[in-house]
């Protein structure tokens, strides 16, 4: 039985190599190939209980690498940009899938709202701060230090249009965002994201959150915890 499983894994790996074209050593090639073989098509609701071996798992808010894998397997990009790559999940996923990748972050010296970022990307993955839910640095250019929600949304809007212009015709921008509560008030940041550019929205995907404090807390009364984020897919016309 163990031999058969190894043969199946090896076959899946070879199929993955033939399909995606591996150019760099992977963290776990056979596991990734097996995931791609078994994955179901992307739908409007996704759940990733495990984040996988990609990126720095100590980086605050680092998302699951399986989300990036599913986006890349669905849209088949040849050139990916992550303008706020944080813990490097997207960089490592693209390396493992043999996809040309460019990534920047303020902590490595690039201000994505002002500095050159290249051009002609067919997929941009963008996971900005959720306003000041987590403050990522002392740098005043950090979006998490924007101050008011109005100022944050103004910077988010300016960033969105800058990134959108870097897409090739037919390219997509996937923006991962979550809502928050502040002093008892619900702030629907995901709704604000949809309002950035309604005419170019192609899909909205609800992503279940795992391993957050709301999962482990028992609430009483009428309080409803936030256990989801959304990925809004914007598509530049072909």
Across the structure, where does each feature detected by a protein language model lie?
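Class I S-adenosyl-L-methionine-dependent methyltransferase catalytic core
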Residues: 2-238
């Amino acid at each position: 039985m163990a031999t058969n499983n190894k043969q199946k894994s090896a076959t899946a790996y070879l199929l993955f190599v033939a399909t995606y074209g591996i150019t760099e050593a992977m963290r776990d090639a056979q596991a990734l190939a097996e995931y791609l073989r078994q994955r179901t098509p992307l739908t409007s609701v996704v759940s990733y209980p495990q984040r996988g071996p990609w990126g720095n798992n100590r980086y605050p808010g680092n998302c699951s690498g399986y989300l990036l894998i599913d986006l890349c397997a669905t849209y088949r990009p040849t050139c990916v940009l992550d303008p706020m790559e944080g813990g490097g999940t997207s960089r490592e996923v693209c390396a493992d899938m043999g996809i040309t990748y460019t990534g920047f972050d303020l902590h490595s010296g690039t201000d994505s709202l002002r500095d050159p970022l290249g051009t002609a990307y067919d997929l941009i993955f963008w996971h900005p701060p959720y306003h000041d839910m987590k403050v990522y640095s002392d740098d005043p250019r950090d979006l998490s230090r924007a101050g008011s929600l109005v100022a944050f949304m103004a910077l988010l809007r300016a960033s969105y249009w800058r990134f959108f212009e870097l897409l090739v015709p037919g390219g997509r921008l996937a923006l991962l965002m979550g809502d928050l509560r502040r002093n008892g008030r619900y702030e629907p940041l995901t709704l604000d994201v949809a309002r950035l550019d309604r005419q170019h929205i192609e899909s909205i995907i609800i992503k279940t959150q795992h391993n957050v404090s709301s999962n482990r807390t028992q609430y009483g009364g009428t309080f409803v915890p936030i256990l989801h984020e959304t990925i809004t897919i914007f598509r530049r016309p072909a």
